[in-house]
């Protein structure tokens, strides 16, 4: 049962497979404007299957789809930001022959989310400004399509819905609303995130935090976002962790690499450094809130992870933890500075939880070839 504040993700965005092909910028902008209008609620739908055909094949029987999916994970875990265009091309090609596969749309959405979230890695960033502007609404539209297929079409008996998807849709909806300064869209995304947390609190509380981590520290939205991280830990350990002394050593016997709880720890293969990423975010979030003593305990928790020594972004957490945290906290005070320190790895959004290797020294290949 949902609470009144929760919003079930509706089936109100459709991207035909033809719209996913690489297009010149002049054609993409009208496309995304139309997608955004649907997002805001112009094109509502009932939530029924709508007569769409049952998928004729899954990714296990489609070699093109399987190869595209495997290559995405190779690029993603390999910290290969320069490989995003290759991953996009393969996923778009796979969608042409496997258009009812939700995984393809979800991963294609992830490439756009990754692209804009780490745009400083693109040496052509100035030339790609139009592309970055399209990335977030494109990601949201693709996550909506993936969720539609995953939640609202028929599947074989035993199929398990992917409850990560409402979280991805929610956070990209909020960020799209923030990009366009559209308060109703932000509110819509927040409602989707509430539903996502209801479905999968261990994972989606992190998305609810990430949607508002840049809000001013004294706002209700920031306090609620910070509380979402606490709620995520509570869901992981099955009890209410001490907010003043959040030592996680007593709960290490709960570490697992299976089921939903693997999202909490370091045993999962999709996000092997999810635990360290959570600790970094919550520690930094507590510093922003002025809770320095609790932040120090939280930073120390990261060392409990079996794979902490191999975490490619370990030095970021260690340098922050060793710094003057009171001085850092002061930078978040109202009017203190226009550019306070970020609450995650600077200029990184995805890789510090997912990447298994350090960043390669490589040149970025343009995402789109712009033609006159």
What are the functions of these language-model segments?
Residues 28-39:
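Bacterial N-terminal signal peptides
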Residues 47-55, 59, 63-90, 110-195, ...:
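Short coil/linker segments at helix-helix boundaries
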């Amino acid at each position: 049962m949902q609470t009144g504040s929760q919003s079930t993700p509706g089936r109100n965005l459709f991207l035909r497979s033809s719209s996913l092909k690489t297009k010149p910028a002049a054609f993409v902008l009208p496309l995304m404007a139309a997608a955004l209008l649907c997002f805001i609620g112009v094109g509502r739908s009932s939530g029924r299957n709508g007569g769409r055909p049952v998928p004729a094949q899954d990714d296990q029987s489609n070699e093109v789809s399987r190869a595209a999916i495997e290559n995405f994970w190779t690029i993603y875990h390999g910290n290969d930001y320069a490989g995003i265009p290759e991953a996009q091309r393969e996923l778009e090609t796979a969608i042409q022959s496997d258009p009812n596969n939700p995984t393809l749309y979800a991963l294609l959405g992830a490439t756009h989310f990754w692209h804009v979230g780490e745009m400083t890695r693109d040496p052509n960033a100035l030339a790609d400004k139009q592309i970055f502007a399209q990335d977030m609404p494109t990601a949201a539209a693709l996550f909506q399509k993936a969720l539609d297929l995953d939640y609202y079409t028929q599947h074989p008996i035993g199929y398990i819905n992917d409850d990560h998807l409402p979280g991805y849709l929610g956070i990209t909806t909020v960020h799209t609303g923030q990009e366009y300064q559209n308060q109703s869209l932000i509110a819509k995304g927040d409602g989707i995130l509430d539903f996502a947390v209801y479905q999968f609190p261990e994972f989606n509380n992190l998305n609810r935090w990430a949607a508002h981590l840049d809000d001013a520290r004294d706002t209700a939205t920031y306090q609620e976002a910070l509380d979402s991280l606490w709620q995520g830990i509570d869901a992981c350990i099955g009890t209410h962790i001490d907010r003043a002394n959040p030592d996680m050593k007593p709960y290490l016997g709960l570490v697992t690499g299976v089921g939903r709880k693997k999202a909490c720890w370091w045993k999962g293969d999709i996000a092997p450094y999810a635990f360290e990423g959570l600790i970094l975010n919550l520690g930094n979030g507590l510093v922003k809130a002025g809770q320095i003593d609790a932040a120090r305990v939280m930073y120390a928790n990261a060392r409990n992870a079996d794979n902490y020594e191999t975490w490619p972004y370990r030095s970021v957490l260690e340098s922050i933890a060793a710094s003057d945290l009171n001085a850092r906290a002061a930078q978040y005070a109202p009017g203190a500075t226009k550019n306070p320190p970020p609450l995650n790895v600077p200029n990184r959004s995805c890789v510090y939880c997912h990447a298994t290797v350090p960043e390669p020294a490589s040149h970025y290949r343009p995402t789109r070839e712009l033609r006159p």
